[in-house]
Amino acid sequence: MPKRGNRHAFDRQTDRQTDRRIVGLDYARAVAILLVLLVHAIENLYVMDAVHLNAMSVQSRIFAIICFTLGRLGVPLFLFLSGYLLLDRSYTELSIHKFWKKNWLGMLVTTEVWIILYDVFLRAFHFQHWSTWGLLRDMLLTNQVHMAHMWYMPMIIGVYVCIPFAARALQGIPLRVVFFPLALFSAYAFGVPAWKSIFPKSPALVLIDLGFAGGVYGLYLLWGWRVKKGLFKNIHARTIGGCTVALFLLVLGIELASYARGIAYNVWYNNAFLAGSALLLFSLFVRIKNGLDYSALCWLSRNSFGIYLLHFPALMLIRKILLVLPWMMPAKVMILWLAVLFVSCVLCWIIDHFPRLARILLYNR
């Protein structure tokens, strides 16, 4: 397989030393995109508030919260991948300019093209009225396109600008020195929201400025880099797996307890228990060296960014059909999830046959 440069976590990645794909990272990336599609399927069929969920059967409510929480693991996995692949590299002045030109600018161009396509789609299918001024605001990244998944793109574009600087800084610092600020910032960024999820009336706030560390999402990248540097390598996989499940069940318990009290709590990425579960899960993926039916998984991994960009318009159209059908909600969720995955994969496969178009629309390099 031809060698490809390290790119965004959704992107095609190769091991620089062996010139082969890293199996564990392909597993992580493929699972991550499946989880992202799952959470979007849940959010677009269920109304995730206390009134609506508590009016449903216990089974349907538990199904919704489990799938929702599973889906929330997708974005952390992508961010860990970015940190794992991009922060443990040597950046010279020349390579920094190359990174900005090929990686950052390429991602920006792809994002802008999709913003235009999304706005045209929303108008063509009567989801919103056309507004040239609104399109301009969307393209300037001062307003989010009316598609729930697009919050991610401005965030990762902003983070990407500083990746070379962060990588160069980390190269000159021993791991034991990095631990203190990383642990301190993480305790505030993730710990306080986790505390408030258990005690909703707590007045606790995160007052320490985390901007220099990249905020919550920058910390995800740093922890991904820390896994690359051997975090958890001396801990048995069974222990890590048990802790992964325990933290995930803790998040579920908090959500279910909140809904039982009539309070809607839908976990976000700043929750320490969710972040910890995702980090441990990622460290397990990294240990995978081979797997069954790797060709299909490899294709899904390589095209995960394209699927991410393509899936939401398909989801919006298929959702309209499913909403009027008298089927159980869990069945609708599974159908929506699989149908969106299928349509997105087919569109990716077609676009992939036109390399220049794929370069722009799918960010293929």
Regions found by a protein language model. Give the residues of each.
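C-terminal "closing" transmembrane helix and its immediate cytosolic amphipathic cap
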Residues: P2-H8, D15, K289-S301, F312-R365
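Functionally critical transmembrane alpha-helices in membrane proteins and complexes, commonly lining
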Residues: V23-D88, L108-T111, I115
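Aromatic-anchored segments of alpha-helical transmembrane domains
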Residues: L34, L38-A41, I115-I116, L182-K196, ...
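Transmembrane alpha-helical segments and their boundary/interface "anchor" motifs
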Residues: S60, F68-L77, D88-R123, F127-V145, ...
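Interfacial loop-to-helix transition and helix-capping segments at the boundaries
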Residues: F63-V75, L140-M155, P193-Y220, I254-L280
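Hydrophobic transmembrane alpha-helices
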Residues: F80, Y84-D88, V159, I163-A167, ...
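Solvent-exposed interhelical
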Residues: Y160-A187, W225-V245
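Alpha-helical transmembrane segments and terminal signal-anchor/GPI-anchor hydrophobic tails
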Residues: G214-G215, F232-C298, M329-A331
